[in-house]
């Protein structure tokens, strides 16, 4: 496997190795083919790229900083830790990078209505935000379980004018919301644009979302070059579907000196049935239009994912991650709920930054690794979102701990 093959594509059929593809209903096939054509044309259009750059700068607030986490670095006593500050974006996470790109594409295609799925609510908020900015009606599908634990984001979406459809099927989480959104899309193919929130779904979504997120890695390269005069030694990001990770990783896949670590949600532990670690605890299968690693039982039924973090609570992973796992370019590990919570508290106290529970999984892995590494090792952690949305979850967890103390 030569280095140049780490950033292969996907190919014309949307495949990364044996992963990805377009496993969709016949009624949707013309639509995804049309979307792929439109996206290729937009990518080659200087006017589209100019408009995208304008919104990235003046609406999202990019570039965001690459911040040296000095006190966390001292606390760990090893590698020099930098945070890529995606939580400083408008709407408080990396999700808006992708939403701005897709809404500009929807506008270009003449679509009149946006739909999306959301787990933690951050993609829902980002979609509702861009829908408001461009004057488009917007329907957000959200699992009933997630609505319960993400009340603040539900209210934000409503404030922005979105209609929220609670999904009670299955476990009432992200995978069920995605199923409902796909059903809506099949029914309303003419005027509706489905704004997928992660690097999953049928081709061209995994590549398109990655491309819109790849600004994270591009900025990181330039910013670290300016600060340290060289490439990072390691990159760490949390992986649910995996768009913040793909956004950071993609720029560095062909740099053999850069070690890349994706962090899955280990829940109560990968040895239990309460986790969301598709690569460390799943097998290949097909879900939501693409072939990837999935959590499934012996009969091939999708099993429930569990994570304290609603945004990582997905039983699959983006197909490019599955490919990078198989060719061993990226190392995928898992972090438990408790480890993520410890890292959450440490980051609050040491850096004065309240990270999302998703990002706390990456921080936990960084805190584990840093002490074993030399002081000149440069580690970049993607701080994918801020933790405001997780206050209730953390409060509940702390209250439960006090009860058991």
Curated annotation (Swiss-Prot):
The gene is trpB. This is Tryptophan synthase beta chain. Tetramer of two alpha and two beta chains. It catalyses: (1S,2R)-1-C-(indol-3-yl)glycerol 3-phosphate + L-serine = D-glyceraldehyde 3-phosphate + L-tryptophan + H2O. InterPro entries: Trp_synth_b_CS, Trp_synth_beta, Trp_synth_beta/beta-like, TrpB-like_PALP, TrpB-like_PALP_sf. Belongs to the TrpB family. The modification N6-(pyridoxal phosphate)lysine is found at residue 95. GO terms for cellular component: cytoplasm. Its EC number is 4.2.1.20. The keyword Lyase applies. Keywords: Amino-acid biosynthesis, Aromatic amino acid biosynthesis, Lyase, Pyridoxal phosphate, Tryptophan biosynthesis. Pathway: Amino-acid biosynthesis; L-tryptophan biosynthesis; L-tryptophan from chorismate: step 5/5. The keyword rRNA-binding does not apply. It is an enzyme of class 4 (lyase). Pfam families: PALP (PF00291). GO terms for molecular function: tryptophan synthase activity. The beta subunit is responsible for the synthesis of L-tryptophan from indole and L-serine. It comes from Pseudomonas putida (strain ATCC 700007 / DSM 6899 / JCM 31910 / BCRC 17059 / LMG 24140 / F1). Its cofactor is pyridoxal 5'-phosphate. Gene3D superfamilies: 3.40.50.1100.
């Amino acid at each position: 496997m030569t280095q140049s093959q780490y950033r292969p594509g996907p190919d014309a059929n949307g495949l990364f190795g044996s992963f990805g593809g377009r496993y969709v209903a016949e009624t949707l096939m013309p639509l995804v083919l049309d979307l792929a054509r439109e996206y290729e044309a937009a990518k080659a259009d200087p006017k589209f790229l100019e408009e995208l750059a304008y919104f990235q700068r003046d609406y999202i607030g990019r570039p965001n900083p690459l911040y040296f986490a000095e006190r966390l670095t001292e606390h760990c006593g090893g590698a020099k830790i930098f945070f890529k500050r995606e939580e400083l974006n408008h709407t408080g996470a990396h999700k808006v990078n992708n939403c701005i790109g897709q809404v500009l594409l929807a506008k270009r295609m003449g679509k009149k209505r946006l739909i999306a799925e959301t787990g933690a609510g951050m993609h829902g908020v980002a979609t509702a935000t861009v829908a408001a900015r461009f004057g488009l009606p917007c329907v957000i599908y959200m699992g009933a379980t997630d609505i319960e634990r993400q009340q603040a984001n539900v209210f934000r979406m409503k404030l922005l004018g979105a209609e929220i459809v609670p999904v009670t099927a299955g476990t009432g989480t992200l995978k069920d919301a995605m199923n409902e959104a796909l059903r809506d899309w099949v029914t309303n193919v003419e005027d509706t644009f489905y704004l997928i929130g992660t690097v999953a779904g049928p081709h061209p979504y995994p590549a398109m979302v990655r491309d819109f997120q790849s600004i994270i890695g591009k900025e990181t390269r330039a910013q670290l070059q300016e600060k340290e005069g060289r490439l990072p030694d390691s990159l760490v990001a949390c992986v649910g579907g995996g768009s913040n990770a793909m956004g950071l990783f993609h720029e560095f896949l062909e740099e053999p000196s850069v070690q890349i670590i994706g962090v899955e949600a280990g829940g109560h532990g990968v040895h239990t049935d309460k986790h969301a670690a598709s690569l460390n605890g799943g097998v290949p299968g097909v879900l939501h239009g693409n072939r990837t690693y999935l959590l499934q039982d012996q009969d091939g039924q999708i099993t429930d994912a569990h994570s304290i973090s609603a945004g990582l609570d997905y039983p699959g992973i983006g197909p490019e991650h599955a490919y990078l796992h198989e060719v061993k370019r990226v190392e995928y590990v898992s972090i438990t709920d408790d480890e993520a919570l410890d890292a959450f508290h440490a980051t609050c106290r040491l850096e004065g930054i309240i990270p999302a529970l998703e990002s706390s999984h990456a921080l936990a892995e960084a805190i584990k690794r840093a002490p074993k590494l030399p002081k000149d090792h440069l580690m970049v952690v993607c701080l994918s979102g801020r933790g405001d949305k997780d206050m209730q979850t953390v409060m509940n967890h702390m209250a439960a701990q006090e009860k058991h103390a």
